[in-house]
């Protein structure tokens, strides 16, 4: 087999990264976007010792699970890897692959959306100048080239409206000082726009146009970033209009959301996810709970409505200050947050009676030391919320070595049209 050779193939399997699997003379070939059962003409683009990669040249026999692409940049933008699949098939596809990861553990049916479009509450648009024209949109897959577009079909309609307005009004002079434009639209109908770049001088007039056009813009910020790497946000900023935060809402609690703070991008499914986490804890109202990796306190505040007390632990001081502001705003006297390293906190509280620990770590999951810290407090139950099924699977094995087994995993489709998936895992002590 050589590069640029063409073959007629039939897809026999798929991977969790959206590649079809075909075999040519006992050589496995991975073909992006090819569905099981499809027949296609492909071209080989890379050959390794034991496997190769191909691309579809012509689809000869499409699957009944394939749908027409409705997005004008779906083939070039790296955002939506699964848009060619019907939504029902996306759920089946994700469920199949997540079930493989958790052998011997019950995996409950995946919870999807009624409408899997226009759901995201946050967008980051890179800004570049090419051939004397401003480019705004999304990065091409595996590239720093910008794919321009009129709208994004998984972004909230209001975000698309603000994005379209900025595209029409931005000048070359404005764009030369920018790296990104960041737009948020909250479930309370507040809009935040953050310009990221080296100088705000040329952006002030655009800021004025935005606030005069969109009545529900409550925050416009310029974030200074002169770095030469891929980090989006810089350390310093200036408020051009309103506040440096917007008000969000989750399960009845208001959340003061600073533009640097993490918040789930799918508000409807976030409530499904956190409701499943609370359900897994099986709370009676008498429990003492810990919210590890607490961030701005969203999970802990939701839990506090069903528990006796909640302590949130977070190492970032600004996030802790925000979380405590949020508890005051929602009159949650039995929920508070501390700024402390997780190891120190665990050892300070190892003699306390902790009923449930909620964990929501970043994509890389937990370290073994982090897992040891968690079980130092000997909770009756652990509820692990994960945005990466692979690191969750790894961590559940380590928890089992230290005496906690997983009863079940509940997948939630938070990132429709993409390969992303959230999961809630319920762990209990091995008796």
What is each stretch, according to the model?
Residues 109-116, 179-184, 410-414:
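Short, solvent-exposed loop/turn elements at beta->coil junctions and helix N-caps
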């Amino acid at each position: 087999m050589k590069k640029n050779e063409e073959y007629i193939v039939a897809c026999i399997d798929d991977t969790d990264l959206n590649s079809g699997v075909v075999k040519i003379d006992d050589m496995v070939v991975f073909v992006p976007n090819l569905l099981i059962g499809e027949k296609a003409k492909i071209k080989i683009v890379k050959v390794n010792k034991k496997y190769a990669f191909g691309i579809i040249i012509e689809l000869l026999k499409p699957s009944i699970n394939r749908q027409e692409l409705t997005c004008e940049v779906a083939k070039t933008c790296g955002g939506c890897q699964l848009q060619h699949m019907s939504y029902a098939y996306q759920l089946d596809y994700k469920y199949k692959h997540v079930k493989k990861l958790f052998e011997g553990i019950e995996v409950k049916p995946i919870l999807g959306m009624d409408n899997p479009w226009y759901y995201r509450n946050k967008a980051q648009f890179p800004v570049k100048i090419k051939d004397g024209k401003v480019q705004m949109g999304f990065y091409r897959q595996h590239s720093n080239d910008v794919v321009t577009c009129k709208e994004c079909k998984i972004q909230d309609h209001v975000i698309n409206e603000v994005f379209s307005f900025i595209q029409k009004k931005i000048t070359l002079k404005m764009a030369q000082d920018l790296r990104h434009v960041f737009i948020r639209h909250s479930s309370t109908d507040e809009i935040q726009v953050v310009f990221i770049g080296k100088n705000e001088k040329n952006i002030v007039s655009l800021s004025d146009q935005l606030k005069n056009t969109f009545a529900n813009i409550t925050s416009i910020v310029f974030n200074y970033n002169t770095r030469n790497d891929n980090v989006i946000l810089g350390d310093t900023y200036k408020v051009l209009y309103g506040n440096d935060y917007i008000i969000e809402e989750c399960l009845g609690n208001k959340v003061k959301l600073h533009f640097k703070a993490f918040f789930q991008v799918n508000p409807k499914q976030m409530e499904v996810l956190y409701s499943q986490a609370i359900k897994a804890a099986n709370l009676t109202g008498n429990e003492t709970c810990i919210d590890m990796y607490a961030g701005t306190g969203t999970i802990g505040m939701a839990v506090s409505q069903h528990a006796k007390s909640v302590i949130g632990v977070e190492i970032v001081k600004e996030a802790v200050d925000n979380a405590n502001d949020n508890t005051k705003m929602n009159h949650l006297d039995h929920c508070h947050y501390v700024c402390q390293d997780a190891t120190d906190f665990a050892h300070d509280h190892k003699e306390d009676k902790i009923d449930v620990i909620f964990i929501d770590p970043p994509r890389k999951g937990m370290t073994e030391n982090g897992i040891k810290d968690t079980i130092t407090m000997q909770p009756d139950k652990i509820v692990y919320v994960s945005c990466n099924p692979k690191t969750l699977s790894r961590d559940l094995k380590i928890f089992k070595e230290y005496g906690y087994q997983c009863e079940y995993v509940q997948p939630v489709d938070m990132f429709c049209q993409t390969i992303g998936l959230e999961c809630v895992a319920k762990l209990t002590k091995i008796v």
